[in-house]
Amino acid sequence: MSNTEKNLPTKYDHMSVEEGLYQWWLEGKYFEATGDEKKQPYTIVIPPPNVTGKLHLGHAWDTTLQDILTRTKRMQGYDVLWLPGMDHAGIATQAKVEGKLREEGISRYDLGREKFLEKAWEWKEEYASHIRQQWGKVGLGLDYSRERFTLDKGLSDAVNKVFVQLYEKGLIYRGEYIINWDPATRTALSDIEVIHKEVQGAFYHMNYPLTDGSGHIRLATTRPETMLGDTAVAVHPEDDRYKHLIGKTVTLPIVGREIPIIADEYVEKDFGTGVVKITPAHDPNDFEVGNRHDLPRILVMNEDGSMNEKAGKYNGMDRFECRKALVKDLQEAGVLVEIEPHMHSVGHSERSGAVVEPYLSTQWFVKMAPLAEKAIELQQKEEEKVTFVPDRFENTYLRWMENIHDWCISRQLWWGHRIPAWYHKETGEVYVGTEAPADIENWNQDNDVLDTWFSSALWPFSTLGWPNEDAADFKRYYSTDALVTGYDIIFFWVSRMIFQGLEFTGERPFKDVLIHGLVRDEQGRKMSKSLGNGIDPMDVIEKYGADAMRFFLSTGSAPGQDLRFSMEKVESTWNFINKIWNASRFVLMNMDDMKFEEIDLTGEKSVADKWILTRLNETIESVTRNMDKYEFGEAGRSLYNFIWDDFCDWYIEMAKLPLYGEDEAAKKTTRSILSYVLDQTMRLLHPFMPFVTEKIWQHLPHEGESITVAAWPTVREDLQDTEAAAEMHLLVDIIRSVRNIRAEVNTPMSKKVQMQIKAKDEAVLAQLTKNSSYIERFCNPSELTIQTDLQAPEKAMTAIVTGAELFLPLADLINLDEERARLEKELEKFDKEVERVQKKLSNQGFVAKAPAAVIEGERAKEQDYLEKREAVRQRLADLEK
């Protein structure tokens, strides 16, 4: 692709810059892991998006961070594998496919299981193609030769093997439990698929009569229809109000069933009346109480949310119709004494919107305690543990693991990994295996499929060839180096990958977990359909380009924090890229057909040359260090400041002096430095902005085919010159101060004015005299005087910089009162700085713990501020004369 044109197009057009580049990268196989044994492997597996539709901004953010990591590591010489893939997303995909069928007037039952699954696979192929297109638009450097899908044969084999082995170890069992039940889709839901909403409900206060006729006991419920399944009433064992009733019975209203009054510490004495109804088949807490007291479990609902025969005369009614009818009957019977309005949180199915029912069901479960124990123990081993970034999320993870419940893994769906369990048609015997029974005609396979998170938990190793532990990719690329994901799925996904990885590979599945937050709108609200504040990343790319979106997403927040999305800030990033483009055009137009081998940094350098090379070194160090710490925002800020301020605003302007001069050697050195600095900067920026950096780099004198595989910049000690950097800082301070003064008195830079500089000592005088051409070029003085023994002229505007004082005699333009006010403001600023640094230096803890270089730096600051403050005081005194 190498482009020999020296000029970039006049205007930056993100669409033309980004067009075709991704396909060119893919054709060059730059993203494919090589297996080169001379290189150290670096692996990331992409968190697989659901094959349910479009990727959102959260995906764009998450994958951009991974792309930054993998592009950086590839340039640093690693054998990088970034493995792509997608998740079948059980209930989410099935709901979409069923919705599409409903539009055609068909249900999945009309089609039957096999035909329905064919439709689901068609959906998968269509949407997988959309997702790949979106990945390409974002510019993700994925190794498509290794793309995986959670229902691939290899991954399905891994799922079956894990299920069977856990079953054989007694860690998978089948039993009754209260699960989240969606009556609309008729399946169990994981907690993450339940959305809690505040709804207006009521407390229904009822009197349950004591069977012996001695009175009644009052309680309240928000779900009166479940009382039909009550099997006890509970009070706290230490509640003096009810101690005498423990062991007695009440008669369940309407039903007439006699149920016991039991004592259990689950009851809160101070909440309500201190009495609760116990319905073990319809409430998870009641289920636990029922187990402790050996209570019967009476299920009064069907799977579709209608009442069953156990509900007596309400049999066949919808649960909410039953509630109305039952409340009316309770009122007429004098049992219901009060209906108290009550706002409370109610779980709704994320997919169907139906109110979720806590429901007693026979399901498959993973026994979590033994698995969690190993994962907790791992975190005590410093060299082997999973490192969370930020580290506060390790506590979140451990807290969940320490309080873990058994995991319901069966789902009443068709789309997914079918549970590898069969039931004998005659004996009811259960067979679990990776292969079907030999006499399959005598067995029925379990109809349920596994929770999507079950296969996702195996993702880091199943994608690399496990259970074949001799698979080349598994041996080379496992365990992986980093996982990038949101804090909202630490429990649902991260924790499960860790315990499954430990159980089946004996290793952590990843070394580091980089946690990011959620993308919110500018007001800090979560993006949602109901608020209408969602933004399609493809729309952002169309308007401003992938590079602008990526840079904003990756630098807009610190690790673990939420990101407030702002289209205005994306536009600002586009403006930044436009500035880079224009600066690159200037550099390329002044290359004079320079070839890569002609770049020579050994010639005599100006102070500006030495300074920009030193600043480049500092930027390389800062960006590399922050990338290693996952501080992409800090790395981005270092790059932004270097490119915008140092390179574009200062060095390019200063480079015009030799470029437009007569000294050919100086021209060659300047061209070499411009080319070198722009090349190195494009490499540093490439992981953030892959498209524009490739485009510019291809126009620069370069070696190699693509910037994607160009070497990552390293600090060059031979180009480091801290003295020159200090000289340049003084020049920049002087030029900035003069510009500020001119702006204050509305004197344009084109108007020549007298300028006097009082140097602090002979060394500063020598520096300023040597570099006076820069001062003359950028300050435009009619006359420049630099001395060590200058007296401040009357009615002069003043600026104090480190090592010098500036005087601009602007007698006709100066307002003495305004100048006095300005200097007093300066004095106040230096007073605060002196106070701050002296407070720091008087802190014994700081002095005892801080490195000597840091303390020395603070003392140097103190001296500098004291000198500047004294100079301001002197100028104020002069104004009073």
Swiss-Prot record:
Name the Pfam families on file.
Anticodon_1, tRNA-synt_1, Val_tRNA-synt_C
Q: What is its main location?
A: cytoplasm
Q: Where is this motif: 'HIGH' region?
A: 49-59
Name where it's found. Answer: Cytoplasm
What are the GO BP annotations of this UniProt entry? valyl-tRNA aminoacylation
Q: What class of enzyme is it?
A: ligase
Quote the EC number.
6.1.1.9
Motif segment ('KMSKS' region): 526-530
Q: Which GO terms describe its cellular component?
A: cytosol
Is-annotated flag, keyword tRNA-binding?
no
Q: What does this protein do?
A: Catalyzes the attachment of valine to tRNA(Val). As ValRS can inadvertently accommodate and process structurally similar amino acids such as threonine, to avoid such errors, it has a 'posttransfer' editing activity that hydrolyzes mischarged Thr-tRNA(Val) in a tRNA-dependent manner.
Assembly and interaction partners: Monomer.
Q: What is this protein called?
A: Valine--tRNA ligase
The organism is Bacillus thuringiensis subsp. konkukian (strain 97-27)
UniProt lineage: Bacteria, Bacillati, Bacillota, Bacilli, Bacillales
